[in-house]
Curated annotation (Swiss-Prot):
It is found in: Cell membrane; Cytoplasm. Pfam families: P-loop_SecA, SecA_DEAD, SecA_PP_bind, SecA_SW. Its EC number is 7.4.2.8. It catalyses: ATP + H2O + cellular proteinSide 1 = ADP + phosphate + cellular proteinSide 2. NCBIfam families: PRK12904.1, secA. It comes from Mycolicibacterium smegmatis (strain ATCC 700084 / mc(2)155). SMART domains: SecA_DEAD, SecA_PP_bind. InterPro entries: Helicase_ATP-bd, Helicase_C-like, P-loop_NTPase, SecA, SecA_CS, SecA_DEAD, SecA_motor_DEAD, SecA_preprotein_X-link_dom. It is a peripheral membrane protein. Part of the Sec protein translocase complex. Interacts with the SecYEG preprotein conducting channel. Has a central role in coupling the hydrolysis of ATP to the transfer of proteins into and across the cell membrane, serving as an ATP-driven molecular motor driving the stepwise translocation of polypeptide chains across the membrane. Residues 929-947 have a biased composition (Basic and acidic residues). This is Protein translocase subunit SecA 1.
Length: 953
């Protein structure tokens, strides 16, 4: 219903866009008369008009006309009216729903050119590195011709290369790269280390894939956590001895396991414990569950493979081996234990954001896709994006045949091979979509037996994929591809002219970026030849019936099925599609497979006879709708919980930014000092009369914070009335704040004597950054732990989300208070020296004395900064202190960063891709439950904190 309501205004929007296209057409004649130099000069003219205050909306028709003409001159491609309409829809911040083959990549040139004129940057987001590089080179030719800079962000780039790419007018890249750069910028220790320059306008290609499929998986930067891995091995030993349906049960549909009473007793017996579910043993339950899941739900060579002693995950939808990707929550370690390979460290979150919240940072967001219809409600609800269906340039004439359902998988594949062989014999190109590498290889063997020549796309190399897909429309071509392989590349009947021309030029050693002038000259020479060859072949293919798309299994999302179908019938070409299914397919097994099997058995049909029944088609559609709804709920839930973190993240990141941008922090440090002293005094004077206050304890606590210069007995004696009871809280607080300010001024003089003028400001910056980062990491850790168990609140009739919001807020406020206290303690007590003239390879560890840092703690946690236990000012005098040094070094603060791991969604959104970053030694293999690590982290934090005596109240 909501989808229908959202689509009510579509007709009006399309009419409005038609008017825009007509206006652009009216300007085209004048623009065509301009020389290349005059066309290029238009860019500067537009930039000046924008700088003078002209609105981009008013500039749209002229800018679109100029960009359209440039594309024609450079690429020999002129935007159709429907592409101009699509470009306008993108500029107005909508999702343009354009069918496959309608030229989405070329459409994006128009709004990206227009919005780049403001100088604030445009980000064009694609699904993989190959497409980002291809589009930046291919469409970049148009932008460069018009005098704009184009950059591309790829996964292996250095920070300097990234910074240069972001500084360009238009930047191409993948959603993961943009998101990780944002997180890394908010972990940077200086403004110079940051690479992004704001979030002005984003055009998301394949918007459904990025904003919907991938939105279930947050982007996470993590580092290794301490812990022991022997429990993984212990449970990997126990679980094979347990019997399914005796000791435990498995729900394949929900992918969960449940341990029976007999199973609990068996585990208790094996471990020699009395009660598995008592508090002390509760971490063992997650080890047991993970070991059972590893046994029952994760199959070798289907869900993962073992290569060179490493467990590598296979994406269930694309069939890709995802190098470096690891499951979270100890699941990967459980699989490693099952396969008896080295168990690698469990990771701790250092920074995280969901794609939903990352893309909501943009002032304006838009997107393109061929299949947004089924998700219009979600795009509107979460991103406030309207979906505008752009008419096709030519009417669609593809024939979508009804599904054929076979009893067994073997019978299904035999029928597929028969069909393919028949089509190949008459010269019709065939594209076969499979759901896994295993299936595509099985089908490939069957085709080889039948002597049908074919290409197999196992989706490992995007570049090769694109080349094969570009030729998949040639006469008699048979291509076996996993569902998502080769996305973003058009299958043109007779062969893709642009790709084949580009291929020939690259074979000659020409490149659009390295040798742009030679490439452009040769391009116009080669293009007509290739066009003629392809046109001749296209006629033969059309005669044979166009591209035949054959799906071997239904995907759990209707949208992915539609994408596969949409590869045929582009630009008014003839085409055909059909899905072959069997009762053994994943979707059938999960929903009503048993009912259908009973029906087929009753009908007593032979295995090789398919059924075409409306009931079956309805059942499949219903199953897909259920899965889509479940996934939408999952994404909404992820967003609701991340919304709590998002508010906190904004506060912390804004504070970090303020510190990094060089704001004078003296005032902030003073405010923190006053707040901390006030909190100490409030704690000591909260209850009772003045004579009940334990000032002795208060002074002991204050001495751990800063060198107190007054005695509480003197305060009482100097009181005018002379009675101890006459000392008020205000007088006490006032005296202590004045004393703390005196001590801080002295501290500043000492620091500047060691490290030169302005050293205190630098120390304030270093200390605040270090403490904010560490406290934020600890807070993320605590929030992860809170979220893990919050679902149980529902049993007490409480809304888990409300509880999470309330407790998360309390924890955040507590963290901010602890942050102030720790920062003040550091500013007074951290050991400072002038930085050496020559940078040392490795900083020397300070000697383990009471007045120095706890070296053991610093070694354990490379990012933790310890404090001295005594309240004295620990400044180390150096012989060369008289000589002014360029900077200071605070021991325990400028620590080595741990190796980082990046986790994010893969192209289909279900997978989590990780890659280890540089920055420090590789951590020793470690595991341990989150609870154990949390306790260890707490003890560590306590060890690092200056001793603080208990205060009353």
């Amino acid at each position: 219903m909501l989808s229908k309501l959202l689509r009510l205004g579509e007709g009006r929007m399309v009419k409005r866009l038609r008017k825009v296209a007509d206006y652009v057409n009216a300007l085209s004649d004048d623009v065509e008369k301009l020389s290349d130099a005059e066309l290029r000069a238009k860019t500067e003219e537009f930039k000046k008009r924008v700088a003078d205050g002209e609105d981009l909306d008013d500039l749209l028709p002229e800018a679109f006309a100029v960009a359209r003409e440039a594309a024609w001159r450079v690429l020999n491609q002129r935007h159709f009216d429907v592409q101009v309409m699509g470009g306008a829809a993108l500029h107005f911040g909508n999702v343009a729903e354009m069918k496959t083959g309608e030229g989405k990549t070329l459409t994006a040139v128009l709004p990206s050119y227009l919005n780049a004129l403001s100088g604030k940057g445009v980000h064009v987001v694609t699904v993989n590195d190959y497409l980002a590089r291809r589009d930046s080179e291919w469409m970049g030719r148009v932008h460069r011709f018009l005098g704009l800079d184009v950059g591309v962000i790829l996964s292996g780039m250095t920070p300097d290369e990234r910074r240069a790419a972001y500084a360009a007018d238009i930047t191409y890249g993948t959603n993961n790269e943009f998101g990780f750069d944002y997180l890394r910028d908010n972990m940077a220790h200086s403004v110079d280390d940051m690479v992004q320059r704001g979030h002005n306008f984003a055009i998301v290609d394949e918007v459904d894939s990025i904003l919907i499929d991938e939105a279930r998986t947050p982007l996470i930067i993590s580092g290794p956590a301490d812990g022991a891995s022997h429990w993984y091995q212990e449970f990997a030993r126990i679980v094979p001895m347990m019997e399914k349906d005796v000791h435990y049960e498995v729900d394949l549909r929900k992918r969960t396991v449940g341990v029976h009473e007999l199973g609990v007793e068996f585990v208790e017996d094996q471990l020699g414990i009395d009660n598995l579910y008592e508090a002390a043993n509760s971490p063992l339950v997650s080890y047991l569950n993970n070991a059972l899941k590893a046994k029952e739900l994760f199959q070798r060579d289907k869900d993962y493979i073992v290569r060179n002693g490493e467990v590598l995950i296979v994406d269930e939808f694309t069939g890709r081996v995802l190098m470096g990707r690891r499951y979270n929550e100890g699941m990967h370690q459980a699989i490693e234990a099952k396969e008896r390979v080295e168990i690698k460290a469990e990771n701790q979150t250092l920074a995280t954001i969901t794609l939903q919240n990352y893309f909501r940072l943009y002032d304006k967001l838009s997107g393109m896709t061929g299949t947004a219809e089924t998700e219009a409600a979600e795009l509107h609800e979460i991103y406030k994006l309207g979906v505008v269906p752009i008419p096709t340039n030519k009417p669609m004439v593809r024939q979508d045949q009804s599904d054929l359902i076979y009893k067994t998988e073997e019978a299904k594949f035999l029928a597929v091979v028969d069909d393919v062989a028949e089509r190949h014999a008459k010269g019709q190109p065939v594209l076969i979509g499979t759901t896994s590498v295993e299936r595509s290889e099985y089908l490939s063997k069957m085709l080889t037996k039948r002597r049908v020549p074919h290409n197999v796309l196992n989706a490992k190399y995007h570049e090769q994929e694109a080349n094969i897909i570009a030729e998949a429309g040639r006469r008699g071509a048979v291509t076996v591809a996993t569902n998502m392989a080769g996305r973003g590349t058009d299958i043109v009947l007779g062969g893709n002219v642009d790709f084949l021309a580009d291929k020939r030029l690259r074979e000659r050693g020409l490149d659009p970026v390295e040798t742009p002038e030679e490439y452009e000259a040769a391009w116009h020479e080669v293009l007509p030849q290739v066009k003629a060859e392809c046109a001749k072949e296209a006629e033969q293919v059309i005669e044979a019936g166009g591209l035949y798309v054959l799906g071997t299994e239904r995907h759990e999302s209707r949208r992915i099925d539609n994408q596969l179908r949409g590869r045929s019938g582009r630009q008014g070409d003839p085409g055909e599609s059909r899905f072959y299914l069997s009762l053994g397919d994943e979707l059938m097994r999960r929903f009503n497979g048993a009912t259908l099997e009973t029906l087929l058995t009753r009908l007593n049909l032979p295995d090789d006879v398919p059924i075409e029944a409306k009931m079956v088609s309805r059942a499949i559609k219903s199953a897909q709708t259920q899965v889509e709804q479940q996934n939408f709920e999952v994404r909404k839930n992820v967003l609701k919980y991340d919304e709590v973190m998002n508010q906190q993240r904004k506060v912390i990141y804004a504070e970090r930014r303020r510190i990094l941008e060089g704001e004078n922090l003296a005032e902030q440090a003073h405010k923190m000092l006053v707040d901390v002293i006030t909190a100490y005094v409030d704690g000591a004077t909260a209850e009772g009369y003045a004579e009940d206050w334990d000032l002795e304890t208060l002074w002991t606590a204050l001495k751990t914070l800063y060198p107190v210069g007054i005695d509480h007995r003197d305060l009482i004696d100097s009181d005018a009335v002379g009675e101890p009871g006459e000392l008020t809280r205000e007088e006490l607080l006032d005296a202590l704040i004045k004393d703390a300010e005196r001590a801080y001024a002295e501290r500043e003089k000492q620091i500047e004597a060691i490290a030169g003028e302005g050293a205190m400001r630098q120390l304030e910056r270093n200390v605040l950054l270090n403490v904010i980062d560490r406290k934020w990491r600890e807070h993320l850790y605590e929030m992860d732990y809170l979220k893990e168990g919050i679902g149980l609140r529902a049993m007490a009739q409480r809304d888990p989300l409300v509880e999470y919001q309330r407790e998360g807020y309390d924890m955040f406020v507590g963290m901010l208070e602890a942050l102030k206290e720790e920062s003040v303690g550091f500013l007074f007590n951290v050991q400072v020296e002038a930085a050496p003239q020559q940078p040392q390879v490795a900083p020397q560890a300070p000697p383990p004395t009471l007045s120095e840092f706890a070296a053991a703690a610093a070694a354990k946690a490379s990012d933790s900064a310890a404090k001295p236990d005594s309240g004295s000012v620990a400044t180390k005098e150096r012989a060369e202190a008289e000589r002014p040094a360029p900077a200071l070094r605070a021991k325990g603060i400028d620590n080595e960063a741990p190796p980082l791991t990046y986790t994010g969604p893969s192209e289909d959104g279900t997978a989590q891709v990780q890659r280890s970053g540089n920055g420090g030694r590789h951590a020793a293999p470690a595991g341990g439950s989150r609870r154990e690590r949390r306790e260890a982290a707490r003890k560590q934090a306590k060890a690092d904190r200056p001793a603080k005596s208990h205060r009353k109240g």
